[in-house]
């Protein structure tokens, strides 16, 4: 990791995804990188994305270690870490997960009025793979209801979707809750606009097909995790991974994504192909 950083140019971005279970040596390295003498002086945007598990998926000892790692990194650089949650079931204890994350921020002295983002990833299908736990689209409104209630309970919380923001998440919203919608982020950086303006604005919450590519250790390129069965190319196929080569691969991905038609409930949904792309095109291949 340190060698990777040494070879990076200023004003570039490096992100590390971790479950938080690491040795003290690895933690010390991350602390050096997020600190002033690491990525900041080199003008490199470095961040850690920490996957925060539910207690049914992790031991108490390992959960405590994840908290220790998170507090250490946030204590060194408050912008150096973001928590990540998988939305896999309406029965998961999402409230406890958020409470634990909020407790960490409050314990470190998060100023009143300042918000923090929690990255959320719905459990999309993985094309070509059976047995993968998937959040059914029919459960999206109930999941959205859970998230709206949490936004009311934790006023400094914001939810960030790296990719699509399925509008059906808001199917059970009440009019007095409309302002909460703008505390959702989609495509990684855009705040969801006022819900009353959705019909009058050209908004698209669907597949962020122009997002950064996934590149595996062999150099094979994939559009995103749900479509790892569809190799789009290899970085050695191009002299450089520039805008032209990336657009070529995205075009190849979209032609593949539209090979399958939407299933219900998306097929009859008024949002489909207006503001949404079935949450994820991978649902169409089930």
Question: Where on the chain are the PLM-derived regions?
Answer:
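Radical SAM/AdoMet-radical enzyme domain recognition
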Residues: 1-142
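Short, acidic, Ser/Thr-enriched surface-loop or helix-capping motifs
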Residues: 215-216
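Short, small/polar residue-rich loop motifs at catalytic or cofactor-binding pockets
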Residues: 205-210
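Short cysteine/histidine-rich metal-coordination sites, predominantly Zn2+-binding motifs
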Residues: 282-286
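C-terminal accessory region of radical SAM enzymes
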Residues: 141-197, 220-277
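Donor nucleotide-activated moiety binding/catalytic core segment of transferases
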Residues: 200
């Amino acid at each position: 990791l340190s060698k990777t950083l040494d070879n990076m140019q200023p004003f570039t971005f490096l992100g590390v995804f971790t479950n938080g279970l690491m040795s003290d040596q690895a933690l010390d390295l991350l602390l050096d990188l997020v600190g002033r003498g690491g990525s900041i002086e080199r003008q490199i945007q470095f961040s850690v994305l920490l996957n925060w598990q539910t207690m049914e998926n992790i031991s108490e000892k390992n959960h405590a270690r994840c908290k220790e790692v998170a507090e250490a990194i946030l204590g060194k650089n408050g912008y150096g870490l973001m928590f990540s949650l998988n939305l896999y079931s309406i029965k998961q204890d999402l409230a406890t997960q958020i409470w634990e994350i909020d407790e960490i921020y409050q314990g470190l002295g998060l100023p009143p009025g300042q918000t923090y983002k929690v990255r959320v990833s719905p459990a999309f299908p993985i094309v070509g793979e059976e047995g993968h736990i998937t959040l059914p689209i029919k459960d999206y409104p109930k999941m959205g209801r859970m998230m709206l209630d949490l936004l009311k309970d934790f006023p400094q919380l914001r939810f960030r979707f790296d990719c699509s923001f399925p509008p059906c998440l808001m199917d059970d919203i009440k009019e007095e809750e409309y302002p909460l919608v703008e505390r959702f982020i989609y495509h990684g950086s855009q705040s969801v606009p006022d819900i009353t303006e959705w019909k009058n604005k050209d908004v698209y919450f669907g597949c962020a097909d122009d997002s950064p590519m996934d590149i595996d250790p062999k150099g094979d390129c994939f559009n995103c995790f749900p479509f790892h069965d569809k190799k789009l190319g290899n970085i050695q196929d191009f002299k450089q991974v520039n805008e032209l080569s990336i657009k070529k691969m995205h075009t190849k991905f979209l032609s593949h994504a539209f090979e399958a038609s939407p299933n219900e409930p998306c097929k009859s949904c008024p949002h489909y192909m207006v503001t949404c792309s079935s949450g994820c095109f991978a649902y169409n291949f089930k």
